[in-house]
């Protein structure tokens, strides 16, 4: 049972991403209870000890401990960060065979506890594994969320802000689609201070247009670059997961680019994919269908088709 009647988050998988996410939760005071579960129990025990030793410095100290699947029964949110890691040269979709089996075991164990909360999935390929979590759990699709393109969108806003010398918080631009090689930028709706980004570069000539495309390529390929340099990405996605968690637990109705189930929006059905969605205490309140130009529509449908072709190997649809 919950110790204080507050919010409980269970983190499954305390590798680089899971531990960084728990650290972000502690530092931002987002949850009242944080439970760490890992196949390597010793790692989870050590992480819990380490976090507790720093609790005195936290803005809102949480109760944090290593636990087991029974702790999911009273959880508001279960965040899955477990699974095989992406190696140099691997695409996110290369991981699917390894991680589907892992996820079946995890999700069935969570549901056996009597869990009635929300799932947030971070493991790659995140769109595929979010769909798998929905299927394995039997929960309504609005209560199963993937991290989607939240980090890609953050990278996009950062690089555009750097290029235009403005704070990334004031850049309004989205990356949608698969969290992976077929994702796309929505240039037609991107703006800074209400001024379309395409208009901002009109007077700067062809080289400025090429620079925008280079910015997107750097966003799309950022994970490959980071993995090559340091072996894994974890700080950025951990902060993105913390942002989604805050939107859920604080009932914010925040619009974030997560992996959401589509059943009509954007002309797609039966697929989880990165799109802007309203996030609150109940999960995904609604998908925001932004207007796309013809090229963006075609690229989005291609991205969805790529995901569906992978899903067809594992699920009858």
UniProtKB/Swiss-Prot annotation:
Its EC number is 1.1.1.27. It is found in: Cytoplasm. The modification Phosphotyrosine is found at residue 224. Homotetramer. It is an enzyme of class 1 (oxidoreductase). Keywords: Allosteric enzyme, Cytoplasm, NAD, Oxidoreductase, Phosphoprotein. The lineage of its organism: Bacteria, Bacillati, Bacillota, Bacilli, Bacillales. Its main location: cytoplasm. It holds the Pfam family Ldh_1_N. Belongs to the LDH/MDH superfamily. LDH family. CDD domains: HicDH_like. This is L-lactate dehydrogenase. NCBIfam families: L-LDH-NAD (TIGR01771), PRK00066.1 (NF000824), PRK06223.1 (NF004863). It catalyses: (S)-lactate + NAD(+) = pyruvate + NADH + H(+). Pathway: Fermentation; pyruvate fermentation to lactate; (S)-lactate from pyruvate: step 1/1.
């Amino acid at each position: 049972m919950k110790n204080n009647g507050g919010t409980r988050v269970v983190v499954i998988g305390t590798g680089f991403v899971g531990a960084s996410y728990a650290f972000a939760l502690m530092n931002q005071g987002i949850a009242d209870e944080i439970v760490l579960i890992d196949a390597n129990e010793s790692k989870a025990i050590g992480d819990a000890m380490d976090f507790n030793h720093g609790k005195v410095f936290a803005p809102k100290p949480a109760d944090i401990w290593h636990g087991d699947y029974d702790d999911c029964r009273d959880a508001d949110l279960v965040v899955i960060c477990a699974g095989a890691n992406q190696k140099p040269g691997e695409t996110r979709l290369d991981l699917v065979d390894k991680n589907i089996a892992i996820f079946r075991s995890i999700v069935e164990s969570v549901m056996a506890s009597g869990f009635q909360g929300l799932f947030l999935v971070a493991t790659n390929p995140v769109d595929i594994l979010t769909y798998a979590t929905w299927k394995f759990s039997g929960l309504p699709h609005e209560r199963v969320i993937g991290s989607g393109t939240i980090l890609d969108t953050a990278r996009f806003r950062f690089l555009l802000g750097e290029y235009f010398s403005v704070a990334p918080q004031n850049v309004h631009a989205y990356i949608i689609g698969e969290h992976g090689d077929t994702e796309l930028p929505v240039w037609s709706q991107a703006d800074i201070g209400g001024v379309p980004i395409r208009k901002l570069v009109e007077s700067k000539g062809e080289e400025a247009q090429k620079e925008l495309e280079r910015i997107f390529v750097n966003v799309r390929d950022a994970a490959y670059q980071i993995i090559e340099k340091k072996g894994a990405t974890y700080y950025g996605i951990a902060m993105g997961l913390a942002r989604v968690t805050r939107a859920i637990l604080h009932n914010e109705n925040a619009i974030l680019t997560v992996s959401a189930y589509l059943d009509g929006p954007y002309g797609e059905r039966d697929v989880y994919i990165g799109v802007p969605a309203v996030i609150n205490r109940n999960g995904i309140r609604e998908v925001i269908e932004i207007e796309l130009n013809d090229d963006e529509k075609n690229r989005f449908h291609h991205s969805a088709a790529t995901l569906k072709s992978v899903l067809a190997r594992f699920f009858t649809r």
